[in-house]
Amino acid sequence: MARKLDMDKGAIISEYGLSKGDTGSPEVQIALLTARIARLTQHLKEHSFDHHSRRGLMLMVGRRRRLLSYLHGVDVSRYRAILSNLGLRR
């Protein structure tokens, strides 16, 4: 399972990165957090009493929200592009 997650992570970085090996841009960070949030949401559907994971999910959602707010303030066109690419609503 860890190998599959690593492959997904590499694909996300190559797709959303501004250059090769770009892991720090807001787009990459938002896309990686979105993937982790989706996986954790699936986990919580099966394990509804896993409160430690639920707290981690809430922290990730808050971090993604702050990154989206930062990106909106820096460049609105990049913000709108990442929302449409990831299927997020704001």
From Swiss-Prot:
Belongs to the universal ribosomal protein uS15 family. SMART domains: Ribosomal_S15. This is Small ribosomal subunit protein uS15. HAMAP family: Ribosomal_uS15_B. One of its GO terms (molecular function) is rRNA binding. It comes from Tropheryma whipplei (strain Twist) (Whipple's bacillus). Pfam families: Ribosomal_S15 (PF00312). Keywords: Ribonucleoprotein, Ribosomal protein, RNA-binding, rRNA-binding. One of its GO terms (biological process) is translation. Part of the 30S ribosomal subunit. Forms a bridge to the 50S subunit in the 70S ribosome, contacting the 23S rRNA. One of its GO terms (cellular component) is cytosolic small ribosomal subunit. PANTHER family: RIBOSOMAL PROTEIN S15, BACTERIAL AND ORGANELLAR, SMALL RIBOSOMAL SUBUNIT PROTEIN US15M. One of the primary rRNA binding proteins, it binds directly to 16S rRNA where it helps nucleate assembly of the platform of the 30S subunit by binding and bridging several RNA helices of the 16S rRNA. Forms an intersubunit bridge (bridge B4) with the 23S rRNA of the 50S subunit in the ribosome. Signal peptide: none annotated. InterPro entries: Ribosomal_uS15 (IPR000589), Ribosomal_uS15_bac-type (IPR005290), uS15_NS1_RNA-bd_sf (IPR009068).
